[in-house]
Amino acid sequence: APAVGGVLISVIPVKMFAAINIASFLISAFGELFLIFNAAKTTSFKEQAEKKTYSAFLWLLRNKDFRPFLFGDGLINFCVTSGISVAVPFIITNALGISSGSYGIITGCLGFGSVLSALFQTKHPCKTELKYPYVKVGSLGFIMLLIGLIARIPYHHIFTVIAFCILEFIVGWLSVAINIKTITTIQIFVQDDLRGQVIGTLTAVSYSLIPISLLLAGTAVDMVESYVIPLICGSLLVVLLGCIRLLDLRANKLPTE
């Protein structure tokens, strides 16, 4: 798949890829509105589903331990989608002129890192503590900053390809590690009657920001230099993550009733 994507990205404009992704997410979200499970058992299934989703959202907002997961996951999806998913293909194929074959190898490193991270997590599970992975998420922000800086240095084919391979590998590794940490934390620390709604609410909030991010990034690539996008997204992720961390520390210092 990465190799095929590398060939297609050199033929099809990035904006078209963004449009396809936006359409797919909107169709998926629209289709989920009509999913019905055992609807015959209740006369107001839709109302109950809406109330459960609203209750889970309020629970996440009010729970100081899980609030960082709500804001952090949405922030990750928004920044990574623009700074990596859209900007990196454009930088590699258009700005730097790297071949589609090399782009396929670079993208393959992303998948390779994801697979190895998943295998590593099965052998070495993360600690079962109620704590948001600030370091891992912040590392994604710094990687986006590095991507923007590498795109600005004098181009050298071998160095650039190796650098992007390493960075994409780390992105794949961190993305899976963060996702596993989030799901594991919810499964362990959220009560049974809320667990499904909490996972669904986090997913809905995070994924709803992806089309917006794709639209903004797809528009920005024609307005600014491509390296600017990961620099902005990386800075935004690091700064806002720091704000979330400060609010988290402040909330934990407040007396509880």
Predicted feature residues:
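C-terminal transmembrane bundle of multi-pass solute transporters/carriers
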Residues: L26, Y54, L61, T93-E257
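Helix-loop junctions on the cytosolic side of multi-pass membrane transporters
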Residues: A18-Q48, L246-E257
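A single, central transmembrane helix in multi-pass transporters
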Residues: V11-A19, L58-A118
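Hydrophobic alpha-helical transmembrane segments of multipass integral membrane proteins
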Residues: V4-I9, A18-A23, I27, I170
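Glycine/proline-centered helix-kink
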Residues: A1-G6, S10, V86, A118, ...
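Juxtamembrane intracellular "pre-TM" segments in multi-pass secondary transporters
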Residues: F37-G72
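Transmembrane alpha-helix boundary/hinge residues in polytopic small-molecule transporters
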Residues: A3, F69, V86-A87, A177-K181
